[in-house]
């Protein structure tokens, strides 16, 4: 048990270093980082979303929901499809301000604005991605300056549920949703049920080796 705890702590420290390294972030995302607001630049779910963005780079109008402090996915998509119209949004004003500065620094021409889910959105998109907070609030053991980047309700699905209940209205007829979740916190069967209960067709589930995160590709039924 002691060995397992030590291994777990070591893995956590390694992952934290990787996700807070400016050099690794540039190698993985081709984005330079200067100012940051918290020390986790991206997570394991973001990596799987990147894989799916590469598979759907022909989409022209992309909404990066919950873009965080750098709008990493929005900026990355603009790099792989320079003709795309990209909008990145987040609920935190501080993240929006920092993302705007970072996108200018990296010379990525994308739209970045503050919005609580779709509250400030009035157009439709070919592609919407979301990496919602999915850590159950029942496991909350730390005080964060920006808690909405990590914690949801007691089961970890309320934010995703709220998103899915609105997202249909903001998709073009052939539009798709890429929903990122982490099965370490929310089991895959719970994710699938959530999708079906909200009237979506599950096209596929994308995974990566040694990664508990998944991306569910959805279409409106």
Please report, for each region that a protein language model flagged, where it lies by residue:
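Short, conserved glycine- and acidic-residue-centered signature motifs
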Residues: 41-46, 92, 156-160
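Mobile active-site "lid"/loop adjacent to the S-adenosyl-L-methionine
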Residues: 132-159
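Short, basic/low-complexity N-terminal boundary segments at the transition from targeting/disordered tails
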Residues: 1-14
């Amino acid at each position: 048990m002691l060995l397992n705890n030590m291994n777990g702590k070591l893995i956590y420290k390694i992952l934290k270093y990787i996700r807070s390294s400016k050099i690794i972030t540039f190698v993985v995302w081709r984005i330079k980082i200067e100012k940051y607001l918290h020390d986790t630049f991206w997570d394991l779910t973001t990596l799987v979303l990147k894989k799916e963005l590469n598979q759907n780079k022909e989409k022209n109008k992309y909404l990066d929901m919950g873009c965080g402090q750098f709008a990493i996915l929005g900026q990355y998509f603009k790099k792989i499809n320079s003709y795309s119209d990209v909008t990145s949004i987040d609920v935190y004003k501080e993240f929006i301000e920092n993302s705007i500065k970072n996108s200018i620094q990296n010379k990525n021409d994308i739209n970045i604005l503050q919005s609580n889910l779709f509250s400030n959105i009035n157009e439709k998109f070919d592609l919407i991605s979301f990496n919602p907070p999915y850590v159950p609030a029942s496991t909350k053991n730390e005080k964060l300056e920006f808690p909405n980047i990590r914690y949801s309700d007691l089961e970890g699905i309320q934010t995703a549920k709220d998103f899915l209940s609105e997202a249909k209205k903001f998709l073009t007829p052939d539009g798709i949703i890429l929903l990122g979740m982490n099965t370490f916190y929310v089991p895959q069967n719970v994710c699938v049920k959530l999708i079906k209960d909200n009237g979506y067709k599950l096209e596929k589930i994308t995974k990566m080796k040694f990664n508990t995160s998944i991306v569910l590709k959805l279409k409106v039924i």
